[in-house]
Amino acid sequence: MLFIPPPLLCLFIAIAMYFLPKIASYSVHFSVIVFVISLSFLIALSSVMQSLYVKPPLILVTLKAQQN
């Protein structure tokens, strides 16, 4: 499972709910790109938090398993 602190997740959801409709009015592709970038940033941040707690970053393992 992803290790995401609840306040960080709530902040991400709030930012996404605020910005996605505004960005989507410009272009759908651009909003998807921004959403994917922010989501990957959140995943990278969560794996960093995991490594601070001396756990293996499971998200990297699951991503590699999905690619194969």
UniProtKB/Swiss-Prot annotation:
The keyword Transmembrane helix applies. GO terms for cellular component: plasma membrane. It comes from the Bacteria. The chain crosses the membrane at residues 1-21, 28-48. It is found in: Cell membrane. It is a multi-pass membrane protein. Keywords: Cell membrane, Membrane, Transmembrane, Transmembrane helix. Its main location: membrane. This is Uncharacterized protein HI_0148.1. The lineage of its organism: Bacteria, Pseudomonadati, Pseudomonadota, Gammaproteobacteria, Pasteurellales.
